[in-house]
Amino acid sequence: MKILIVVDMQHDFIDGVLGTPEAVAIVPKVKEKIEQYRDDPNGVVIYTADTHHENYLNTMEGKKLPIPHCIHPSHGWMIPEDLYILNSPIIMKNTFGAENLPNYLTSIERICEKDKGSIEAIEIIGLCTDICVISNVMIAKSCYPEVPIIVDSSCCAGVTPESHKNALEAMKMCQIEIV
């Protein structure tokens, strides 16, 4: 099976309080990639969602980035309908990396192995390349060192174009396949 992890494609990161023109620009390609996996009999799509609460400004992240965002269950927290496949798992996380991502991947592998085989590849796309994407890529690589981990750079955007490029280079150095 091939797994697509869609990282934090939420309103606040696309066109909300932390949105950027680059984030808006990748939406059509992200949608196309999600549809490819949805239509592939061996494809599985899972999502992460940055998830904060009213106390966000009191957290370590909130003190360093004092912009409330992805407050559950606000509009900004939501994944746009046209990017979400109904009934697909959403891993809610309150920090950059989804600490329970390994458990989700193991569960998906157990549930789907009979029909779709073992994990052949994990592709990771979304926002922001230089924060949450790279964090989740490293978690996946640590858990599945022998499985190809792929990042489609055209389906990612960073806080800035320069930080996006730097994150892609850092992932390349960690044997991540950048396409």
Task: Name each model-derived stretch.
Residues 133-142:
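Short Gly/Thr/Asp-enriched flexible loops that form oxyanion-binding sites at enzyme active sites
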Residues 12, 51-52, 96, 128-130:
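Short glycine-rich anion-binding loops that position phosphate/pyrophosphate groups of nucleotides
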Residues 57-59, 101-104, 135-136, 162-163:
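Short, well-ordered secondary-structure micro-motifs
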Residues 92-116:
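Alpha-helical scaffold elements lining the catalytic groove of polysaccharide deacetylases
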